[in-house]
Amino acid sequence: MHERHIGPSQEEIDHMLGFLGYKSLDDLMHAALPNGVQSPPDIKIPSHDELTCLTQLAAFAKMNRIKTSMLGQGFYNCITPAVIRRNILENPSWYTSYTPYQPEISQGRLEMLINFQTMICDLTGLEIANASMLDEASCAAEAMLLAKRVSRSSSNKYLVHNGVFPHIRRVLETRADAVGVEIVDLPEGQSIDFDHFGVYAQYQSASGKLLDLRPLFSRSKRAGAICVIGCDLLMLTLFTSPGELGADIAFGSAQRFGIPMNFGGPLASFLAARKAMERSLPGRLVGVSVDADSNHAYRLTLQTREQHIRREKATSNICTATVLMAIAAVAFAQHHGPKGLRAIAHRINTVAVGFARLLKQTAFRVSSLDIFDTIEINNPTQVCVEAESKYDLLFWKVDDNKLRITFDEVTARLDGDLPERLSKVFGISPDKIRDLGCNYDSCDCSFYGDLQQAREGLSSVASRNISVHSDLARHPLRRFSGYLKHPVFNNYTGEVALMRYLKALSDKDFALDRGMIPLGSCTMKLNAAFQLEPVLWPEFANLHPFAPLGDADGTLQIIDQIETWLANLSGYDAVSLQPTAGSQGELAGLLAIRGYYKSLNLDRDVCLIPASAHGTNAASAVLAGMRVVVVACDQQGNIDLDDLRLKASKNAHALAALMVTYPSTHGVYEDNISEVCSVVHKYGGQVYVDGANSNALIGYLRTGDFGGDVSHLNLHKTFGIPHGGGGPGIGPVVAKAHLAPFLPFRNRVHKPSTDLPAVKHMGGPIASSDYGFAGALYISWAYIFCLGSQGMKRCTAVAVLVANYIAKQLSDTFPVLYTGKNNLVAHEFIMDFREVTRVSGITVDDVCKRLIDYGFHAPTMSFPVPGTLMVEPTESEPFSEIQRFIKTIRSIRAEIDRVIDKTYDPDNNPLKRAPHTLEQIASDKWDRPYSRRTGIVYTSGKYWPASARIDNAYGDRNIFCTCPDLPD
């Protein structure tokens, strides 16, 4: 199976090996890997072909039992329009792109992300929103930390209303404890007579009751506190926006905008805030700037907030978003338009309120009719058990005396035999239940969202005396303010228009379907189409994360296998799949270390971090309640052992951990890694190995064997999950046995029939569901199942081979900054441009923009060393593309030499004016001292960037993060 995944043929592999002076891949790896490090045991995972893989996945899918979920709790049935499924979720132009650090070749997804931000701002009534977060519970934690940063209060108390979802409450407790925040319960109606920095309430409480939060927020604001709302986007199409209620921050999940539940995700959450908080906002933020031709263009703005720049002082450790899901969610809004969204919400509300009224006519006691979609019943007796066992209905059981029923886009349709099944459970006539949908069809809900139309609509509804709807029409929290008025939300409700719009946007972007993306530390390898197919199969996609475990037998077997495989491949004893990104895996691992020391009554909080480490490491350490102490690197880019010993001994009483990336962020296998781990262990600390570079390890080296106590792995790098334009990802944490009990909590013990010990994970949860973004795990399962252990080992060796081949080919063009044993690199290497910049004035930014003209995505720029490019080609690239990249870098060097010898003007040359757009080439005006053909580097099938070079400084000086007005 590896023949399809690995780009170069055997003959081409032999050619590259010969060029480097090695006879086999194993010879090369033996020469590159450090001496004295234990080889992994022979892990036997057989390889399989595509058909066998899909057949096995189909068998797992049949083991799942999809019942009618009315569980709610932030996860809802929804309909994914085929136009979105086909044109976004199954389209490599969208799912194989990377985070848009190079904005000129990312204008399509940047436009969709600013559409997403605009949608969130409109619906929440707040001025600024980011480009999506991870799961809803971790987003709630980020909202809490944002409130703490911007509050005028010195208090450490955060008030949490008792109506929030319990899984969100548990994650808040985990995150608050680590940073010294005290969570204080706030029962409904309780007065506040003490200082607090923030208050958080759920707009529609977990019980379903709609809360008028204005009095609560008014009291808190007088005390200098920040007011936070958890809200539902669909509900906000009918009810007053959080901003109008007085909220300073609003967050929630966009899952019900067309994103399947998939046993917990992937999905996109959102976070919006007052404009004054824009520089404290976590996560990615897309803004409007201008390009060199004075055209509007989009870019990531205010990046100085983020961890890759501010490290331990960053606003968050989140270094990505859930871009693909955010794009699908906003496309859902464009597909339906504001009227269509209102209609969906109105039907849900109509059916929910109507059903609650029918229940009140029975022996059941309903808590409130003041609801959007959820009904709480106070005396259900055995309803839950009977509904599930006899009628395949899932209700949320609060306790023995209370249950909740939630209607959504699917169940509110009352299709099929759902009315009959509900009738048998509750003793209500099925005709009366079915009539709720008919009543909806007779009601005009078009007036919501416009003040004047709303006022006129009230009398219209009243005159028709439609009692089912009069509560909504007269509700004190009804929404009068408009939203989604921009043409981008009103011009694409027809499928042809939306299809063409999405196609036009994808054509603006550079993804793996266009060419190589040699981003260092990113591993932009093949995301095989067949591996992605099962993600949207209904047996997987429609599984609620809080469904009974017996309903998820197939998915849980897949999870068991992945956990066992990952543990064996990395050398650890336990795995948690809960982290929804690599950053969250880091946090989970560090919290496990923290929990371990707390269990021993030891106060250890110092985290040693090499100066070369990614900024996420430092930001994660701070969020885990640790103090960062930086360890120097030597001239070869390795950890300075003398400085490590000094820092470890100096902090011996408080040393908790060392975070180290392996291979290093400098692209080499550090020879002294075992000694590094021994030093930390000697002084009582734990070793956290960042697994971001595991594509250089699998099959040859296990971080758990050379001294690692805990690591995270990036399934979106090493194990085939696509990057999705900046997310979603999965960052499972793997740990030794002594840390296993402190991994994120889950309700289920790993089955002892597998190779892993049965250990209960009792650490605090860090995500909304036990298995995080479980819906993407099928991709990694298929990747491992098809390649097998030997195929993955070959992938590692070919990735290292290609990196060394390119590095040696280009060593006389630009120097390779760091090498390891035998002058070899790992799976990536750093090209040093600093001397060239000094003599020519050509910067790495100029080179990156010029690479666009040649049809390449730029390598990673100025990380980990300013003035350099880090190149990671991966094992999947065809040899022809590798050769084209080498030729391109040499051509760019020749262009730089023409600047040095003054053949080219130092400020008006193909590099300084890159990238070159089709608009520029087609223009009658050409004010450049080189030809158009020289500028564009024309080839067959050429990719044209959508914008000229974008002005970064302008974008940061003029913050504008919603859809700009369309030109006349």
UniProtKB/Swiss-Prot annotation:
Pfam families: Aminotran_5 (PF00266), GcvP2_C (PF21478), GDC-P (PF02347). The modification N6-(pyridoxal phosphate)lysine is found at residue 717. It catalyses: N(6)-[(R)-lipoyl]-L-lysyl-[glycine-cleavage complex H protein] + glycine + H(+) = N(6)-[(R)-S(8)-aminomethyldihydrolipoyl]-L-lysyl-[glycine-cleavage complex H protein] + CO2. It is an enzyme of class 1 (oxidoreductase). The keyword Repeat does not apply. InterPro entries: Aminotrans_V_dom, GcvP, GDC-P_C, GDC-P_N, GDC_P, PyrdxlP-dep_Trfase, PyrdxlP-dep_Trfase_major, PyrdxlP-dep_Trfase_small. GO terms for molecular function: glycine binding; glycine dehydrogenase (decarboxylating) activity; pyridoxal phosphate binding. GO terms for biological process: glycine decarboxylation via glycine cleavage system. One of its GO terms (cellular component) is cytosol. Its EC number is 1.4.4.2. Keywords: Oxidoreductase, Pyridoxal phosphate. The glycine cleavage system is composed of four proteins: P, T, L and H. Belongs to the GcvP family. The glycine cleavage system catalyzes the degradation of glycine. The P protein binds the alpha-amino group of glycine through its pyridoxal phosphate cofactor; CO(2) is released and the remaining methylamine moiety is then transferred to the lipoamide cofactor of the H protein. HAMAP family: GcvP. This is Glycine dehydrogenase (decarboxylating). It comes from Tropheryma whipplei (strain TW08/27). The gene is gcvP.
